[in-house]
Amino acid sequence: MSRKYFGTDGIRGRVGEFPITPDFVLKLGWAVGMAFRRQGNCRVLIGKDTRSSGYMFESAFEAGLSASGADTLLLGPMPTPGIAYLTRTFHAEAGVVISASHNPHDDNGIKFFSGQGTKLPDDVELMIEELLDAPMTVVESARLGKVSRINDAAGRYIEFCKSSVPTSTDFNGLKVVLDCANGATYKIAPSVFRELGAEVTVLAASPNGLNINDKCGSTHLDGLQAAVVEHHADLGIAFDGDGDRVMMVDHTGAVVDGDELLFLIARDLQESGRLQGGVVGTLMSNLGLELALQELHIPFVRAKVGDRYVMAELLARNWMLGGENSGHIVCCQNTTTGDAIIAALQVLMALKHRGQTLAEARQGIRKCPQVLINVRFKGESDPLEHPSVKEASVRVTEQMGGRGRVLLRKSGTEPLVRVMVEGDEEASVRAHAEQLAKIVSEVCA
């Protein structure tokens, strides 16, 4: 059954435009409360990133929960994986994240965790959608939900992050630059790395409600690259606005993406005898990752794009490590969702075990040239179903003669078609990608 409101990761859009409006979010809070109250008493955690609109939507969602009779625990600004962790430790029925991740401040969204800190099952999302289309009722006054604030939420999550590495860990002598994207990690990440002994320089840690992801964070690495070189740092770490994506920069200023970080963690786990099963990537994972893992005899499978699908594949196979090239990395031995801070700590441990710099360690993987072009579209029609697009995709695949991949897919969070071509020669890969993107653009027009 198709979803009316939920995308691949909750509900997201432009602030003030349906469904990201206060009245809809209030009804959404009520629907969530009603769905979980069917199982008995209900407590729901709410956390958010640093967008100014987050306060408005927090109040609206909280009001809806109260109307349903569900209690609310407010965390304040908190990385998405921190909300997943605290939902588990507080034994709440659900966790709510008010965030649009790596998007600009004028977008926002709502995503959810189950009481186990995992994405909501499909049947629960469908139940919430049914309730959204039902008349809203309010419980009697004596049964209205109560609201309380968790004042030590940040400290709890900091200690959890530190517990993901051995207690003897000491990063003394390591110079690190952190880019916090003016987002949810702005206080927590510097504390974690400093308390573990690293010398930390911090960028983009002064949120004002409007500057989240603004020319900073994991999707805008120029500032971090320059700062790493300027400060003679060993490496740089960039988070996105809600702290579930991580990208890194080596001491030369070269970018190290999610595929490379995933490889470094997998190799370290294998070398220390801690790797369980194989690695889950996605349709967008670079072919070079697959080949590098193959050389180490580490199994590799591809899930659909989106960390919920990576997590589902990990659970189905009872494996422990997966991720996306965008920097969503799931380490199941520590977390139930992508956690940027914990993933970064695992990479630092891998470097420490090998006695290598990030620049040296990344030589174990040779990425294949990959070109990704985003094409914006309007309307309800699916450009990928157009005969011209299908024919062009088949033609380009045949022209590559089995030495590359073509992937066309719609974004689950934005009105975009992603055109990805991968092969062994960059000029031809770019030419093929531009050719396909041109055809998709013409169809979308």
Swiss-Prot record:
Keyword terms of this UniProt record: Isomerase, Magnesium, Metal-binding, Phosphoprotein
Catalyzed reactions: alpha-D-glucosamine 1-phosphate = D-glucosamine 6-phosphate
Residue positions binding Mg(2+): S101, D240, D242, D244
PTM characteristics: Activated by phosphorylation.
Ribosomal protein keyword on record: no
Top EC category: isomerase
Superkingdom to which the source organism belongs: Bacteria
CDD domains noted in UniProt: GlmM
Entry's Gene Ontology BP terms: carbohydrate metabolic process; peptidoglycan biosynthetic process; UDP-N-acetylglucosamine biosynthetic process
Any one GO cellular component localisation term in the record: cytosol
InterPro entries: A-D-PHexomutase_a/b/a-I, A-D-PHexomutase_a/b/a-I/II/III, A-D-PHexomutase_a/b/a-II, A-D-PHexomutase_a/b/a-III, A-D-PHexomutase_C, A-D-PHexomutase_C_sf, A-D-PHexomutase_CS, Alpha-D-phosphohexomutase_SF
Active site (UniProt): S101
Function in brief: Catalyzes the conversion of glucosamine-6-phosphate to glucosamine-1-phosphate.
PANTHER family: PHOSPHOGLUCOMUTASE (ALPHA-D-GLUCOSE-1,6-BISPHOSPHATE-DEPENDENT), PHOSPHOHEXOSE MUTASE
Protein family: Belongs to the phosphohexose mutase family.
Protein name: Phosphoglucosamine mutase
